[in-house]
Amino acid sequence: MENDRQAIVVWMNHLKQVRSLKRFGNVHYVSRKLKYAVLYCDMAEVEDISEKVSRFHYVKRVEMSFRPFLKTEYESKKEMMYEHKNEDVQISI
């Protein structure tokens, strides 16, 4: 039973309040130089959490990750070339 998770990137003015983000999900990474934190939460709650987090005075902006919507399984080039050759042979017959 695996939950679908999505990352939320929270850009902040100060990193002092990073600990307060723990109640919204799992804080995966914090960049001290660029002042942002990556927060993982359930996909069903992403909209609500991003609205709540963006209301804090120390938050500059909130961005959602598009990784769950990207294709991560790729076909090899050889398989694609083999399929194209087979199609060409069938068309010529």
From Swiss-Prot:
Name this protein carries in UniProt: UPF0298 protein lwe2074
InterPro entries in the cross-refs: DUF2129
Pfam families: DUF2129
Main location: cytoplasm
Keywords: Cytoplasm
Places the protein is found: Cytoplasm
A single cellular component GO annotation: cytoplasm
Record-stated family: Belongs to the UPF0298 family.
Keyword Lyase: no
